[in-house]
Amino acid sequence: MKMSKKVLSVVLACMMLLGAISCAAYAKTSAEADTHLQFNENGEFKILQIADMQDGFPMKLVTKNLIKKAIETQNPDLVVLTGDNINGTAGKSVTYATAINEFMSIFENYGVPVAAVLGNHDAEGSITRAQQIAVYEKYDCFVGCAGEDMGNYTCGTYYVPLYSSTDAEDMIFNIWMIDSGDYNKENDLGGYAAVTKEQIEWYKTAEATLTAANGGETVPSFMFQHIVVPEIFDALEPADETTGTCSAEINGEMVYYKLPEGAKGVLPEYPCPPNYNNGQFDAFYENGNVLGMFFGHDHNNTYEIDYKGIKLVNTPGAGFATYNSENIGVRTITLNENDLTTFETEVVTYLNLFEGDNAAMALYELNSDTTSTWTKIVAFFKYLVYAVQNLAGNFQF
């Protein structure tokens, strides 16, 4: 399976001719983005998915600590941000830039590559999605781009090729980064946006082009986006009040779901996909090259569900400035180039990362939605004590 960099560059450049102004006016195309990533010398490639930080400037210290600790302990080859990276309601360009810098500067300092898509909250202010992507592109660590212009309000749909550890010109895996939009502008059904028909057609064309350039052999892949696909309800198992782990009132009646047998993770939160479907999952399913589809959006869910041969995966939120649970954390996804028909993934929570760290645990108690007001008051004073102790321990007499 071999696709040279030269062939891939020509493929990307030709596809860029389809681009228009709304995205391209602000940001780089895929052909201009530095996306040359290889499996490591052990034949592995580890992705760190960070979802729903949803903070501003300044970012909460506890969230920053989570991100730094995750990078230091998990040693990822790529960080993937899956939207609601910031709280977009501030609506000022300087606020957007400084909010994005709060986490992008961390990745820059660690020297870890980053790809990103936006969520429904990122651009709720006056700054467009294209303008935000342009901010990301100012960082050397960013390997994403605005991608092809789809003729609508989305921006940041592209792909990131991964190359063999032994051959820098052999593309053996692909990562689809899809902008799932924000709120429904297509019809009167309300709710969240669905991936558009134009994006789906772009995917089909891009996938066919990559397959042809790869000698007719499809390239295995992942897909990352913010909002889960509507098929999640087909993948889940209907339940009742006693067996359901999540519920919502739909058309005046309570509806319950639970994870199907064999699924991993938890489902405490009722999923929030679009109310309509443009056929995204079917397109990925029909092409048969997608191992897993990874989402954020529903902050408390951590499920992994096999559905029609594709694993649907939700990653919990990483931000303490928005609603959260004891599962707040990140997700690791590890590939081995010797068998690209499967992968390993796990959620790494804040509590996992900082077990035994008294100061970090006090900071968690101070910021977590899971703790009472009294616990937060006690945690504040505990954190002060631990902080003073740490300062004293580091002071050189």
Where are these regions (language model features)?
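Binuclear metal-dependent phosphoesterase catalytic core
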Residues: 162-163, 175, 271-272, 278-287, ...
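Sec-dependent N-terminal signal peptides of Gram-positive bacterial secreted proteins and lipoproteins
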Residues: 4-26
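Active-site environment of divalent metal-dependent phosphoester hydrolases
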Residues: 56-58, 87-90, 116-128, 183-186, ...
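His/acidic metal-ligating clusters that form di-metal
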Residues: 74-78, 174-176, 189-298, 302
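Metal-dependent catalytic neighborhoods of phosphoester/phosphodiester hydrolases
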Residues: 59-62, 83-105, 122-141, 235, ...
